[in-house]
Amino acid sequence: MRIAVIADTHDRLPPRVLAAIRSADEIWHLGDVCNEAIESALLATRIPLRIVRGNCDSNPGWPLTLDFTLEGFRIHLIHIPPTVAPPDTDLLFHGHTHVPRHEIMVPARFHNPGCITRPNRGAPASFAWLELIKGEAPKWTLEYV
């Protein structure tokens, strides 16, 4: 399964990013969507979409966290990164910092795709691809935009 992971779009989703993620099996947005037109554009792809609410979002229909199992991995989506992963989490995905992250903090791996529109600390604008195959190590790849 190939997942496009984006975060912190802050009212903007560049057309080249939208075109790139059309090959995904799922899209995960890790918060700070800021404009429901972004959600509409993502839904228009007809690719399954998971969104969590960020600190700049006001849509009460978006959950603060999502927990689910996919391809045998226990996954936690959240906007603001916790210090420690919740129990029974293999992979934790967050936004908020606008800086890419790929870090093992036993027992979980923490991932941040960076920010498409307003990256911080000299990081280039980015989103990420996650490839999950049951029984194999997850593959995390940043794509710079």
Residues covered by each model-derived region:
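Binuclear metal-dependent phosphoesterase catalytic core
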Residues: 15, 69-71, 104-105, 110-145
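Active-site neighborhood of phospho(di)ester-bond hydrolases with catalytic His/Asp-centered motifs
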Residues: 5-7, 26-32, 50-55, 76-79, ...
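Short, flexible, glycine/charge-rich loop motifs used to bind or transfer phosphoryl groups or to couple energy/partner
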Residues: 15-20, 38-40, 65-66, 79-85, ...
